């Protein structure tokens, strides 16, 4: 793997983040699970940690930058070892792993409980968060695969 994988991972991560942002826009536009607002929960947690107000753009920017860089780079490094013969299949595996981390670690840290069950909304938040992660990771995988033909097949 040459040094070009970094830029390819960043481009794929950017595309995945853009797809995720579109899904979140549609969630808001169509009023899906209005009581499940993970970015507002993150904003509140950041405000609590810093002891001040946090602008609503901050959690969105952190998520977008994280998806475009850190997660994209992680995906680029583990891509050859992920199961599957396509970028989409590898993206699904990466997304399910990310969803498990979000459900078992991130949501509880935000005070939402395991898989956001503390919101008393049933399995809706868990399923939507799975859709969030799969939207990101499948696009990430497809774009990364297109930019790296023959790698990890």
Q: Where do the language-model regions lie?
A:
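Juxtamembrane/disordered regions of integral membrane proteins
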Residues: 1-153
